[in-house]
């Protein structure tokens, strides 16, 4: 279960208006919640391994799963993967990741997945050339893109399936680099070119991503894209992510810095936190970002002071015990405060409060109301009992 934070709409900028795009049973954009997605590491030719990885991600909360499709054989394997999922588990919305010379691969895989991701810099792959680009060269390149893209657009449109135009900073076409340089403008124009062709072909089931590995570049390009595309009436949803963010604490910090900044601006409709780790570890970070911004409530929101000389109990230990006892609940705000100074005032928005009163004694609050004082040794147990008495407890 998830809820929206009632405080958030009044504090954050209005969310960018985007057209809803259907991806299987999911909706990306419009008024739909921000969608969480990830990508499996397994070879798509390994059907049992791929199915197991997709299931594990989906059970962990990943709503949209991407798989790599580097060849026609991999594209055909998606038929087996999808059927196995439906027969042994349940339908899971799938995205196929297509890159170099992607036309034939994308056409095949479009039959088996809900969305196809193409990379504008590689979809019609041409080796770098020497010399200038004339206007005729540019128009010839656009004609080649249209020729390659039209069959895919026709197939996807006939099935009401989606496409992600996924621009990467590190793989802009040589033509775009020549015209615009290695700039956010070049990334945006790379996406705009493909959007224009799709629109000319009457296809609008589009999601757009513009990823970079440097957070300032990523933020700048999405902000520019929102401005330029919206000015042209291209109100397509955005997929946010910092590509190649790395691992560990810093990888999470980089992803959060980029994704959360844009979401706080009202930009973004689906997110992926890309880590050089097991993809399962990406999912809690995604939901943590959305929870912190109040965009989705999928867990308890904990408020706790950082501790100081006034603290009347071991705050770190008690917070851990409270979290372990209540972490399975959804939509509650629980505050753990070390003393009365930071207690009632700082936890005014909390549903329940656990506050140090005197040495060895804590006070439990419901909202702003002090309910009872109990020995510290029984504090967590008494908090659980209070939640149960209010009918807001569910067994884990």
From Swiss-Prot:
* Pfam family for this entry, one: GcpE
Per the entry, the cofactor note is: Binds 1 [4Fe-4S] cluster.
Q: Which residues cross the membrane?
A: none
Q: So what does this thing catalyse?
A: (2E)-4-hydroxy-3-methylbut-2-enyl diphosphate + 2 oxidized [2Fe-2S]-[ferredoxin] + H2O = 2-C-methyl-D-erythritol 2,4-cyclic diphosphate + 2 reduced [2Fe-2S]-[ferredoxin] + H(+)
Which Enzyme Commission number(s) are on file for it? 1.17.7.1
Per the UniProt entry, the signal peptide is none
Q: Which cofactor does it need?
A: [4Fe-4S] cluster
The organism's place on the tree of life at top rank: Bacteria
Keyword list (alphabetical) reads: 4Fe-4S, Iron, Iron-sulfur, Isoprene biosynthesis, Metal-binding, Oxidoreductase
An example GO biological process term is: terpenoid biosynthetic process
Annotated GO molecular function terms are: 4 iron, 4 sulfur cluster binding; 4-hydroxy-3-methylbut-2-en-1-yl diphosphate synthase activity (ferredoxin); iron ion binding
Q: Which InterPro entries match?
A: Dihydropteroate_synth-like_sf, IspG_bac, IspG_bac-typ, NO2/SO3_Rdtase_4Fe4S_sf
Pathway the protein acts in: Isoprenoid biosynthesis; isopentenyl diphosphate biosynthesis via DXP pathway; isopentenyl diphosphate from 1-deoxy-D-xylulose 5-phosphate: step 5/6
Gene3D superfamilies tied to this protein: Dihydropteroate synthase-like (3.20.20.20), Sulfite Reductase Hemoprotein, domain 1 (3.30.413.10)
Q: Which residues bind [4Fe-4S] cluster?
A: 305, 308, 339, 346
Summary of the function given for this chain in its UniProt record: Converts 2C-methyl-D-erythritol 2,4-cyclodiphosphate (ME-2,4cPP) into 1-hydroxy-2-methyl-2-(E)-butenyl 4-diphosphate.
Q: Which family does it belong to?
A: Belongs to the IspG family.
Q: Which PANTHER family does the record match to this protein?
A: 4-HYDROXY-3-METHYLBUT-2-EN-1-YL DIPHOSPHATE SYNTHASE, 4-HYDROXY-3-METHYLBUT-2-EN-1-YL DIPHOSPHATE SYNTHASE (FERREDOXIN), CHLOROPLASTIC
- The protein here is known as 4-hydroxy-3-methylbut-2-en-1-yl diphosphate synthase (ferredoxin)
């Amino acid at each position: 279960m998830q809820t929206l934070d009632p405080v958030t709409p009044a504090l954050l900028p209005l969310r960018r208006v985007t057209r809803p795009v259907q991806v299987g049973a999911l909706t990306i954009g419009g008024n739909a919640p921000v969608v969480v997605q990830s990508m499996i590491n397994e070879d798509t030719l390994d059907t049992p391994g791929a199915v197991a990885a997709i299931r594990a991600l989906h059970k962990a909360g990943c709503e949209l799963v991407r798989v790599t499709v580097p060849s026609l054989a991999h594209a055909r394997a998606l038929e087996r993967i999808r059927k196995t999922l439906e027969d042994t588990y349940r339908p899971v919305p799938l995205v196929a990741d297509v890159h170099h010379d992607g036309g034939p691969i994308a056409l095949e895989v479009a039959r088996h997945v809900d969305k196809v991701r193409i990379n504008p810099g590689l979809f019609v792959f041409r080796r770098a050339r020497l010399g200038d680009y004339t206007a005729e060269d540019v128009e010839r390149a656009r004609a080649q893109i249209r020729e390659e893209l039209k069959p895919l657009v026709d197939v996807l449109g006939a099935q009401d399936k989606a496409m992600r135009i996924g621009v990467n900073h590190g793989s802009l076409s040589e033509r775009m680099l020549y015209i615009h340089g290695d700039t956010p403008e070049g990334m945006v124009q790379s996406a705009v070119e493909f959007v224009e062709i799709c629109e000319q072909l009457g296809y609008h089931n589009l999601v757009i991503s513009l990823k970079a590995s440097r957070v300032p570049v990523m933020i700048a390009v999405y902000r520019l894209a929102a401005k330029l595309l919206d000015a042209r009436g291209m109100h397509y949803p955005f997929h946010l992510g910092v590509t190649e963010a790395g691992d560990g604490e810093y990888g999470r910090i980089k992803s959060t810095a980029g994704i959360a900044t844009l979401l706080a601006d009202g930009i973004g409709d689906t997110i992926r936190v890309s880590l050089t780790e097991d993809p399962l570890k990406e999912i809690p970070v995604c939901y943590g970002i959305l929870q912190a911004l109040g965009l989705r409530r999928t867990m308890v929101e904990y408020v706790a002071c950082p501790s100081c000389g006034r603290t009347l109990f071991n705050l770190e230990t008690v917070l851990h015990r409270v979290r372990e006892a209540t972490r399975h609940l959804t939509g509650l705000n629980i505050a753990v405060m070390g003393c009365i100074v930071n207690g009632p005032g700082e936890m005014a928005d909390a549903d329940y409060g656990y506050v140090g009163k005197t040495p060895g004694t804590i006070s439990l609050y419901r909202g702003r109301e002090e309910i009872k004082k109990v020995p510290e040794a029984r504090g967590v147990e008494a908090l659980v009992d209070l939640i149960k008495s209010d009918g807001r407890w569910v067994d884990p």
